[in-house]
UniProtKB/Swiss-Prot annotation:
Binds 1 Mg(2+) ion per subunit. The modification N6,N6,N6-trimethyllysine is found at K5. Its main location: plastid. Its cofactor is Mg(2+). It comes from the Eukaryota. RuBisCO catalyzes two reactions: the carboxylation of D-ribulose 1,5-bisphosphate, the primary event in carbon dioxide fixation, as well as the oxidative fragmentation of the pentose substrate in the photorespiration process. Both reactions occur simultaneously and in competition at the same active site. It is an enzyme of class 4 (lyase). The active site is at K166 (proton acceptor), H285 (proton acceptor). The record marks K325 as: Transition state stabilizer. This is Ribulose bisphosphate carboxylase large chain. The gene is rbcL.
């Protein structure tokens, strides 16, 4: 007789192990599982563990050539989701040996590569990942991190201010550079290429880089502050992307930008390594994230994409506003903002954090609040995000009735007023509007902005 029993397998026999003690080196995942009617949660959870690690649908003779116990993923705990019918959180532990060192790409291919189309599941969402210290240490992480960025820019004790140049498509390079100059001269720290500004017929990348560099040197000379413009290096090939980053470095600018989800983690990690080697800061835009993270019961939560970015590398990342035009619940957002900035984050289910995460001194990432925010939001933003953040006002700068530079002045005055008020011990949550009103008495630019965007 054959040495193994052929036939289709019951996953839960092998892959559901409720008494498993997780190891410090395991990668842990929390999945929100919605099984098909009639499929027990243990079977569904086990199926996820199997399908995202060593499993295949039937017994194969080559199983005898390896030690399943050493390499298999294990579903070690299942809990029902409160208030949801037939939804469960399945916790899966993966042995570290299943993953290539320093590759976010491989980590995702393994954990979420195949299993989301699985027939026994109606829906599946990856809510959180615990990356073990041993695996974190195989990544370079952000090119510079929060402290080094502050030192490079010589800006301390306040959030940084940015602005996306609009209209995002259609300006010539020279006019684009002019818009950049106006904003920076008015008092912003950064301006930004829109995520879909790459190298189109109306404005080729090299021309844009040149005029933006000219704009920021001029603004630096006039204001005595260090200025930056996020030059979008995203391109159709990795080689072209690096070529753009090299040109940015040759121009002597401080920062470049990348769309990390559309560009891909492999490209992003290459760019992050280049940026560290060459002293460039790296701003990350999350274009395409909502395709992955918007559905509540299927896909991947943004906190997982944020953790992945910290491993892959980036100094800034867009992370929702809590107050503007795009959705994002406050506690949940603050949860992944901490995951980006802090060195050690405690498990806290009320903030969506399923696992305690130790980043073992990997540099932090500045969260960027951007999308539909204006001067009246400034007190709330200062309070919610604190000093280590970038506040980005696109329309909230360029929509100023007097133009870009006065729009920038209004934002800078509002920010400085909020920071000063906070440092004097005032409560931004309750006195915010009053603080802005008081400041607007001294700044006609701010007064005009307050008029345009009523509270």
């Amino acid at each position: 007789s054959v040495g193994f029993k052929a036939g289709v397998k019951d996953y839960k026999l092998t892959y559901y192990t409720p008494d498993y003690q997780t190891k410090d080196t395991d990668i842990l995942a929390a999945f929100r599982v919605t099984p098909q009617p009639g499929v027990p949660p243990e079977e569904a959870g086990a199926a996820v563990a199997a399908e995202s690690s060593t499993g295949t649908w039937t017994t194969v003779w080559t199983d005898g050539l390896t030690s399943l116990d050493r390499y298999k993923g294990r579903c070690y705990h299942i809990e029902p989701v409160a208030g949801e019918e037939s939804q469960f959180i399945a916790y899966v532990a993966y042995p570290l040996d299943l993953f290539e060192e320093g590759s976010v790409t491989n980590m995702f291919t393994s954990i979420v590569g195949n299993v989301f189309g699985f027939k026994a599941l109606r829906a599946l969402r990856l809510e959180d990942l615990r990356i073990p210290n041993a695996y974190v240490k195989t990544f370079q992480g952000p090119p510079h991190g929060i402290q080094v960025e502050r030192d490079k820019l010589n800006k301390y004790g306040r959030p940084l201010l940015g602005c996306t140049i609009k209209p995002k498509l259609g300006l010539s390079a020279k006019n684009y550079g002019r818009a950049v100059y106006e904003c920076l001269r008015g008092g912003l720290d950064f301006t930004k290429d829109d995520e879909n500004v790459n190298s189109q017929p109306f404005m080729r990348w090299r021309d844009r880089f040149l005029f933006c560099a000219e704009a920021l040197y001029k603004a630096q000379a006039e204001t005595g502050e260090i200025k930056g413009h996020y030059l979008n290096a995203t391109a159709g090939t990795c080689e072209e992307m690096i070529k753009r980053a090299v040109f940015a470095r040759e121009l002597g600018v401080p920062i470049v930008m990348h769309d990390y989800l559309t560009g891909g983690f492999t490209a992003n990690t290459s760019l992050a390594h280049y940026c560290r080697d060459n002293g460039l800061l790296l701003h990350i835009h999350r274009a395409m994230h909502a395709v992955i993270d918007r559905q509540k019961n299927h896909g991947m939560h943004f906190r997982v994409l944020a953790k992945a970015l910290r491993l892959s590398g980036g100094d800034h990342i867009h992370s929702g506003t809590v107050v503007g035009k795009l959705e994002g619940e406050r506690e949940i957002t603050l949860g992944f903002v901490d995951l980006l900035r802090d060195d050690f984050v405690e498990k806290d289910r009320s903030r969506g954090i399923y696992f305690t995460q130790d980043w073992v001194s990997l540099p932090g990432v500045l969260p960027v609040a951007s999308g539909g925010i204006h001067v009246w939001h400034m007190p709330a933003l200062t309070e919610i995000f604190g000093d280590d953040s970038v506040l980005q006002f696109g329309g909230g700068t360029l929509g100023h009735p007097w133009g870009n530079a006065p729009g920038a002045v209004a934002n800078r005055v509002a920010l400085e007023a909020c920071v000063q008020a906070r440092n004097e011990g005032r409560d931004l949550a309750s006195e915010g509007n009053q603080i802005i009103r008081e400041a607007s008495k001294w700044s006609p630019e701010l007064a005009a902005a307050c008029e345009v965007w009523k509270e």
